[in-house]
Amino acid sequence: DGKPAADIPVRFQLLSTAEGTRTTAAVDSPVVLTDADGVAETRIKLGDKTGSYQVGSEIMAPDKGFLVSSKPVKIFGFNLVGVVVSVLGGLSLFVFGMKLMGDGIQKIAGENMKKLLQFFARNGIVAVLAGTLVTAVIQSSSATTVMVIGFINAGLLSLVQSIGIIFGANIGTTVTAQIISFNLSGLALPAITIGFLITLSSRRVISGWGETILGFGLLFFGMTMMSDELKVLGEFGSFREAFNYFDCSPVNGWMPFLAVLGAMGIGVVATVLIQSSSAAMGIVLALAGSGLINFYTAVPLLVGTNIGTTITAMLAAIAANRVAKQAALAHTLFNVFGALLMLLLFYVPYGPERIPVFLYFINEITPGNAFAAVPQNLERHIAMAHTFFNIAVVVVLLPFIRQFAMLCNWILPIPNNAPVKITMLEPNLLSAPSIALKQTIRAIKVMVED
């Protein structure tokens, strides 16, 4: 009759729990009578896992003629500590795996990779290739740039030579994103097992292969941990709404400018805090894989990670000579120029759907459609955008390396007739023992001559 029905028994039962819940979820009062307002209430004790819990409610009065006798209710349980531990734990494994891979490959290659930087830096194009190769091997553009600053401070490289290597480092760092964009999580545990067993070898090269395989497994295992936790959070409406503040999806045909700047700023801050653009890219890929961000938002985020990674070189150059400071400045200017170029391309539409031309290009050369209602192969699109973005900036600036060096010298000039301080025993060269040893011998000779 449309009026509240009091004293009607309603039964509540737990239909499903969040996947992986270890503690038992339960209904406090399985059967409850409705009150004067026709409302039946009970409390649900959720498990320890973040995720969806489904509760069924059934009216136990078939003779009353209610139009609806049962209704399932979906509840989202949130374990803050569990989420933080899982995401940070996954990120830690990811970064450690990345470092282990780099260390393993360096063991296999010996000191040859680091000697490449000094040997091939004489030609701009070859210097870019050397920077790309070394960074792809050691899995860190920051480490390459810090090493370059060490070479400059020790008088082993000039500013013009170092700029080519820095350009290449930005391309080499995209290899990590390319690797993790493939769905190889099923190989993580076998790789960890096999890699660990191989590391037990007493032979350096074989042990290096073991570290490489073990690092590969840890990298994907950490990525899977982050992705799985973020996918569950993606079901939580309030959590998804938080990402709308920097959603860069076009409004009236244009990407919202403030949202784009906000996403780039978040990329900068995240990379500065983590001290690794590759790790920050891993988070971007995990967010995209969980459906929390789209292609429009991911690209400004990755542009921000490129700017944030320059902080490491800046810190390393504080105690170095003026030329090393100019190299750190070159790294920063290169990445800022790339960000400004990409910001401009965001507002150059192409095609009937007025998609930004760079995003349109990436979507055309990558399998799947990143702009579909349900984005396809989104992680691969983001990795390809990261790689081609850095390649494009290098192609634009490579013919102007000398002019770029002149700009750095104009911003941070060396006083006339002022000698450039050379530090033979440069601490940043310790990661390349053979070169550090040569510098030590050189320093001893200078001491003897003096």
Where do the protein language model's features map onto the residues?
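Membrane-interfacial helix-loop connectors
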Residues: 135-140, 146-172, 178-187, 197-199, ...
